[in-house]
């Protein structure tokens, strides 16, 4: 398990995730955001009609962690470690080497 930084246009937070996810964070996050939330078995959880016939999805880092825990890596439970008290573009120097993704 490795630490990564995830955000969704809000406070950046450190999560611990499986090594495979941390080492390929962009791929896992992109697959979740571009495929899973639209076509996965829980798509109705994310899909919202904003106006007649105009649909979109709403999700964030906690939803990605739920996906990892329930569907992708149930044998390795990911979890929140701590919030950094800043946005993804203000990461403190000591954490800049962490893999990061902003949804």
Task: For each feature predicted by the language model, list its residue ranges.
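Short, extreme N-terminal segment that most often corresponds to the first beta-strand
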Residues: 1-22
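Short, surface-exposed linear segments at secondary-structure transitions and domain or protein termini
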Residues: 22-32
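Short, mixed-charge low-complexity intrinsically disordered segments
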Residues: 33-103
């Amino acid at each position: 398990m490795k630490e990564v930084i995830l955000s969704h246009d809000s406070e950046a937070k450190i999560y611990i995730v499986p090594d495979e996810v941390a080492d390929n964070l962009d791929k896992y996050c992109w697959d979740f955001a571009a495929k899973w939330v639209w076509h996965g078995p829980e798509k109705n959880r994310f899909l919202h009609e904003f106006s007649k016939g105009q649909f979109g999805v709403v999700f964030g880092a906690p939803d990605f962690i739920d996906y990892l825990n329930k569907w992708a890596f149930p044998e390795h439970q990911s979890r929140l470690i701590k919030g950094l008290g800043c946005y993804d573009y203000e990461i403190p120097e000591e954490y800049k080497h962490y893999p990061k993704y902003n949804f």
